[in-house]
């Protein structure tokens, strides 16, 4: 059989085998390449996914975010865009979405505005002085900040003179106890969104908005004064603020409201409809220079502990009516200039005006040019000074006054140009009460014993005809 085999078949079979072998190798290489490619893709996808998960995890570690706009206006010089005391906080700072150090110097020619985001890695319990004196802060949004355990917000934005708007709408202030000087000196601040601001736990609001000269709108349902102990100068010098609502449902707390609305020139209405009985311990200067205030009802204020009402309504030139008939003045010692320049006030009910502890009522009605009649003869007045008491009361026609052992009566009836009847039958001293007057009403002087310089200089020339001068003593000049 071997003899029948063609020798030419042998090379052909080997060639076929080699071809098949090469073909198999090529297929194997292609398959290996596909496997490598798939493996590479899987590895890349895994790596990308892991990196993304890492970023997400890092992102989840940021408990708080604050977004703010900063403005730089310099020319060819370096300036610090950010300089905020975050030394006790682990934060990440992003300027225009680029992470950087929290102190950031910037070389700039012209004017620029930068979006800055603060991300905190830890729980916040104190925001005191966080942005204080950051003078290039323009806008702030605290929507993303977690403040559940924050108790102190003192000086948070104090001195931020470029701040125009602040969104505090969604931050939790339930546990905040002190907001002293929170926005003090933000003199360009126009609007604050505090719609969901809760102050039920707050005790200190001293100077909270003081010197916010341009603040015209506070978007807040109400300020809850239930536990507030000190509101001294809270809205002082808020020239453009025209309306505010106060709420209180706790009679026990004693609150300092000295100068609370002092210099609120545009304040027309103080809404106290939901204001329960409130113990007040300081009230002087409370409405001083509130030129636009037309009426006020303080019947819900318990002032039994108050010792001074000095300048309480001074320069309230639009005030037409005031109800103080329910107020307890038993402990008030100082009443000086309380109604000074209330030029539209025509009458006032003083039936409950207890002056048993009063030491001075100087200038009490100074410049009340529309006041026509007043009676103080039922008062228990044992005071040292009534100087300027009715000075400038140009419409005053009838006065009854009872004062014992007073020492200072300077200008008490000065410029009372309409005065017709003056009952001084229980008055024992006039001093220089009419020092520069050229007119004199009908006066009963029977019991007057001390009248040094009552008419100023040239006494004899200035005493009106018909006066009873027989019992007048001590007429030295």
Question: Language-model segments: which ranges?
Answer:
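Ankyrin-repeat helical core positions
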Residues: 132, 157-158, 183-184, 210, ...
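Disordered, charged N-terminal biogenesis/targeting segments of membrane/secreted proteins
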Residues: 1-15, 235, 261, 390
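Register-specific detector for alpha-helical tandem repeat solenoids, activating on a conserved position
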Residues: 128-129, 154-155, 180-181, 206-207, ...
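N-terminal capping/linker segments that flank leucine-rich repeat
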Residues: 8-16, 20-149, 222-224, 246-250, ...
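Small/polar residue-rich beta-strand/coil "junction" motifs that cap repeat-based extracellular fibers
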Residues: 389, 412, 438-440
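Structural signature of tandem-repeat unit edges
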Residues: 114-122, 136-149, 161-177, 187-203, ...
């Amino acid at each position: 059989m071997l003899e029948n085999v063609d020798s030419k078949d042998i090379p052909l079979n080997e060639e076929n085998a080699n071809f098949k072998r090469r073909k198999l190798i090529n297929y194997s290489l292609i398959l290996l390449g596909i496997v490598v490619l798939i493996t590479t893709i899987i590895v890349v996808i895994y790596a990308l996914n892991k990196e993304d998960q890492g970023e997400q995890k890092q992102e989840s570690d940021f408990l708080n975010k604050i977004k703010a706009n900063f403005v730089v206006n310099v020319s060819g010089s370096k300036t610090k865009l950010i300089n905020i005391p975050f030394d006790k906080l682990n934060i990440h700072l992003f300027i225009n979405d680029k992470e950087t150090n929290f102190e950031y110097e910037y070389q700039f020619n012209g004017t620029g505005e930068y979006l800055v985001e603060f991300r905190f890695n830890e729980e916040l319990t104190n925001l005191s002085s966080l942005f204080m004196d950051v003078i290039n802060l323009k806008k702030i949004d605290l929507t993303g900040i977690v403040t559940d355990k924050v108790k102190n917000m003192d000086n948070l934005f104090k001195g931020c003179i470029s701040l125009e708007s602040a969104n505090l709408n969604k931050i939790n202030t339930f546990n905040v106890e002190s907001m002293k000087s929170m926005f003090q000196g933000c003199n360009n601040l126009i609007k604050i969104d505090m719609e969901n601001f809760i102050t039920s736990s707050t005790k200190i609001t001293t100077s909270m908005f003081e010197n916010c000269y341009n603040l015209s709108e506070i978007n807040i349902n109400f300020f809850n004064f239930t536990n507030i102990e000190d509101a001294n100068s809270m809205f002082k010098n808020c020239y453009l603020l025209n309306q505010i609502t106060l709420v209180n449902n706790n009679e026990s707390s004693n609150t300092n409201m000295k100068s609370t609305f002092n210099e609120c020139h545009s304040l027309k209405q103080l809404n106290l409809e939901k204001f329960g009985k409130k113990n007040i311990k300081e009230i002087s200067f409370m409405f001083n220079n509130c030129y636009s205030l037309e009426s006020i009802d303080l019947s819900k204020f318990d002032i039994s502990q108050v010792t001074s009402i000095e300048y309480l309504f001074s320069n309230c030139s639009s005030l037409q009516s005031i109800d103080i008939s329910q107020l307890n003045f038993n402990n008030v010692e100082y009443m000086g200039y309380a109604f000074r320049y209330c030029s539209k006030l025509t009458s006032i009910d003083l039936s409950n005006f207890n002056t048993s502890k009063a030491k001075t009522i100087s200038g009490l009605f100074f410049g009340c040019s529309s006041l026509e009649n007043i009676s103080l003869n039922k008062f228990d007045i044992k005071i040292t000074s009534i100087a300027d008491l009715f000075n400038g009361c140009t419409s005053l026609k009838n006065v009854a006054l009872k004062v014992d052992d007073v020492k200072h009566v300077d200008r008490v009836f000065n410029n009372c140009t309409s005065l017709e009847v003056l009952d001084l039958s229980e008055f024992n001293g006039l001093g220089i009460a009419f020092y520069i007057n050229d007119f004199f009403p009908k006066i009963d002087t029977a019991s007057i014993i001390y009248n040094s310089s009552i008419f100023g200089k040239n006494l004899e020339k200035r005493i009106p005809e018909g006066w009873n001068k027989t019992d007048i003593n001590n007429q030295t000049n």
